[in-house]
Amino acid sequence: MSVLRFATRRGLSWCYASRLTHQGTSVTSGEGSPGTRTSRVPARVLNLTRPLSCRAYNSKVPQSPTWEPVSEDLLPPCAQFPADLVDKLERLALVDFRTKQGLECLEKAIRFADQLHVVDTSGVEPMDSVLEDRVLYLREDEEKEGDCAEELLQLSRNTCEEYYVAPPGNIPLPTREKRAAMLKHSEF
């Protein structure tokens, strides 16, 4: 039984119970684990508790930011990009860097990523997965509502024979010569 359904059966209004469960509050009835019924506890007595993973109680999350700006002296020198490399980046990312503003944005993004070169990673093993050493607690798969395929298909823009239709794939950008012909009066 879901916590929301349990809380509403125990006398909480649906609106209040859903607000509590969305805030991460667990609802228990007296002694026992969350969601268990006990006959000794009146229906109106509920213990509402917040999990210990709240920000105030989590010791792994620092209370203040630990980020410090990196001086420009420690960063590698700024790289100049040949036109061929910019064309390749445009084709792969499907982003247009035709203007000076686009190139400046690209240079700033690369300069920001250069700060990773300063990080000391000696003695740190590479991580294959974020969840590699953790136990994953999964809930049981319970069907909440059934026969809602028609409702879900109505949410899609394109359907064909009760299947979702994916949008068209990436459209490649025109070559540099074609773009040069199109943009004779551009700043780039």
Curated annotation (Swiss-Prot):
Localization terms from the record: Mitochondrion
Domain of life: Eukaryota
Catalytic activity: L-glutamyl-tRNA(Gln) + L-glutamine + ATP + H2O = L-glutaminyl-tRNA(Gln) + L-glutamate + ADP + phosphate + H(+)
GO molecular function: ATP binding; glutaminyl-tRNA synthase (glutamine-hydrolyzing) activity
Transit peptide endpoints, chain numbering: 1-11
Biological-process GO terms, alphabetical: glutaminyl-tRNAGln biosynthesis via transamidation; mitochondrial translation; regulation of translational fidelity
GO cellular component: glutamyl-tRNA(Gln) amidotransferase complex; mitochondrion
Transmembrane segments: none
InterPro entries for the chain: Asp/Glu-ADT_sf_sub_c, GatC
EC number: 6.3.5.-
Keywords recorded for this protein, A-Z: ATP-binding, Ligase, Mitochondrion, Nucleotide-binding, Protein biosynthesis, Transit peptide
Enzyme type, top EC level: ligase
Coiled coil, from the record: none
Main location: mitochondrion
PANTHER family assigned: GLUTAMYL-TRNA(GLN) AMIDOTRANSFERASE SUBUNIT C, MITOCHONDRIAL (PTHR15004:SF0)
Function of the protein: Allows the formation of correctly charged Gln-tRNA(Gln) through the transamidation of misacylated Glu-tRNA(Gln) in the mitochondria. The reaction takes place in the presence of glutamine and ATP through an activated gamma-phospho-Glu-tRNA(Gln).
Subunit structure: Subunit of the heterotrimeric GatCAB amidotransferase (AdT) complex, composed of A (qrsl1), B (gatb) and C (gatc) subunits.
Entry-linked HAMAP family: GatC (MF_00122)
Protein family according to the UniProt entry: Belongs to the GatC family.
Protein name listed in UniProt: Glutamyl-tRNA(Gln) amidotransferase subunit C, mitochondrial
Organism: Tetraodon nigroviridis (Spotted green pufferfish)
